[in-house]
């Protein structure tokens, strides 16, 4: 089942690239926010404070992707296309699925070299996945 192994491997690469990007975005947002206190207080802020709310879309994609990786039956051929389209709707180049996310994301791309590097790595991973057919 080489195709299944390739599918799993491709999605694992995507998951890692998304987590790296997510961490870079959280680090920058945390700097913008200011002192957050303990790790527990930081976690509470990230999950419930409006300042970090825009990142929840990306968190949700990562969570869904990781759930699919844990469920062998969820690994279906179209999954790569679906996740590629979903991610590209957030970070580009597809039209924005969430305009607020896209604006904040683009600002961070310009403000943070770490975000820009993580974005570049993510784009390389996405380029390896099949694209959705053109309408």
Labelled PLM ranges:
Residues 1-135:
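Surface-exposed peri-terminal alpha-helical interaction modules
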């Amino acid at each position: 089942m080489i195709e299944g192994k390739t599918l799993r491997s491709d999605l694992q690469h995507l998951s890692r690239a998304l987590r790296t990007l997510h961490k870079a975005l959280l680090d920058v947002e945390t700097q913008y926010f200011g002192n957050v206190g303990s790790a527990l207080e930081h976690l509470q802020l990230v999950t419930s404070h409006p300042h970090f709310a825009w990142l929840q879309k990306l968190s949700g994609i990562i969570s869904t992707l990781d759930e699919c990786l844990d469920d062998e039956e969820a690994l279906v051929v179209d999954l790569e296309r679906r996740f590629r389209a979903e991610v590209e709707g957030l970070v580009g180049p597809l039209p924005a699925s969430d305009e607020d996310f896209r604006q904040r994301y683009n600002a961070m791309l310009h403000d943070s070299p770490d975000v820009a590097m993580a974005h570049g790595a993510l784009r390389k991973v996405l380029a390896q996945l099949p694209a959705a057919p053109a309408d």
